[in-house]
Amino acid sequence: MTIQKNWQELIRPNKLVVTPGSDPTRFATLVAEPLERGFGQTLGNALRRVLLSSLQGAAVQSVHIDGVLHEFSSIAGVREDVTDIVLNIKDISIKMQGEGPKRMVVKKQGPGTVTAGDIQTVGDVVVLNPDLQICTLDEGAEIRMEFTVAGGKGYVAAERNRPEDAPIGLIPVDSLFSPVRKVSYKVENTREGQILDYDKLTMTIETNGAISPDDAVAYAARILQDQLNVFVNFEEPRKEVTQEIIPDLAFNPAFLKKVDELELSVRSANCLKNDNIVYIGDLVQKSEAEMLRTPNFGRKSLNEIKEVLAQMGLHLGMEVPGWPPENIDELAKRFEDHY
């Protein structure tokens, strides 16, 4: 037995379906199927943990408010205490290009509300939730705040954001660097051919807009790939690459696909098998009337088959010249990557 069979003979997802949410930059659902039984939980849990803990992002590390010495202060004419202001600052979502730290400033006079959109940023820093309310100013009140923004990953508590030489009045802030806000997943059974207990992994992801959900999953998968490489203690045998000559066919290569690879109900699949219909090329030449004469084959099965064929651009009652070819089994193997 060759070592490659350990991974080459496992079923792998043949597609990753991404369904955008109401805001495609922030919300999406991703579906991967089919997976070997148990792999849905394995991959879903691993990806979720990496998504929430290991992706790089940007966040406010500290703030300096003019006239304020510490976070337990209050500011004349400002309705919120400094503690509440700092809690609001934690929720500012930021996208930053390049390396930090960077500076942002907000200066405003009352009356009115100070929002994240009032912050003056440099060109490579973008505030992603400008409607976020930071504080409320009364008539005649004024506030000026200077923020330090840096890059990082995961969650960093305020105590770790305080530099050793921090000046008086510098208030460290809890930093949530991860651009991913929420991740959930579920695993369901799915069907591949006649096997009904493969896994289907569905992941629902919300980001802060600094990265799209599908890119976030791609980066998380790349992190896992990189971390797992150290466990591979062998070199794979090199495969001789030969240029395969693909013969010209007088018919659609899809006709060489076996009908048991279609996602048909057990009843429909058994009817085709009992009627010795092996390949799609056998099936499409049948008329609707011929199919309905098949024992135990009813209108429901007919509609199911017509729908599956339509998805492939095919239909019943087709003429297939040169069918069946003499070397049909050999051709089916050679063309299995072409339909």
Curated annotation (Swiss-Prot):
Keywords: DNA-directed RNA polymerase, Nucleotidyltransferase, Transcription, Transferase. InterPro entries: DNA-dir_RNA_pol_insert (IPR011262), DNA-dir_RNA_pol_RpoA/D/Rpb3 (IPR011263), DNA-dir_RpoA (IPR011773), RBP11-like (IPR036603), RNAP_asu_C (IPR011260), RNApol_insert_sf (IPR036643). The keyword Transcription applies. GO terms for biological process: DNA-templated transcription. One of its GO terms (cellular component) is DNA-directed RNA polymerase complex. It catalyses: RNA(n) + a ribonucleoside 5'-triphosphate = RNA(n+1) + diphosphate. Its EC number is 2.7.7.6. It is an enzyme of class 2 (transferase). Coiled coil: none annotated. One of its GO terms (molecular function) is protein dimerization activity. SUPFAM superfamilies: C-terminal domain of RNA polymerase alpha subunit, Insert subdomain of RNA polymerase alpha subunit, RBP11-like subunits of RNA polymerase. Residues 1-235 are annotated as: Alpha N-terminal domain (alpha-NTD). Residues 251-339 are annotated as: Alpha C-terminal domain (alpha-CTD). It comes from the Bacteria. The keyword Transcription applies. Homodimer. The RNAP catalytic core consists of 2 alpha, 1 beta, 1 beta' and 1 omega subunit. When a sigma factor is associated with the core the holoenzyme is formed, which can initiate transcription. Belongs to the RNA polymerase alpha chain family. The N-terminal domain is essential for RNAP assembly and basal transcription, whereas the C-terminal domain is involved in interaction with transcriptional regulators and with upstream promoter elements. DNA-dependent RNA polymerase catalyzes the transcription of DNA into RNA using the four ribonucleoside triphosphates as substrates. This is DNA-directed RNA polymerase subunit alpha. It comes from Rhodopseudomonas palustris (strain BisB18). The lineage of its organism: Bacteria, Pseudomonadati, Pseudomonadota, Alphaproteobacteria, Hyphomicrobiales.
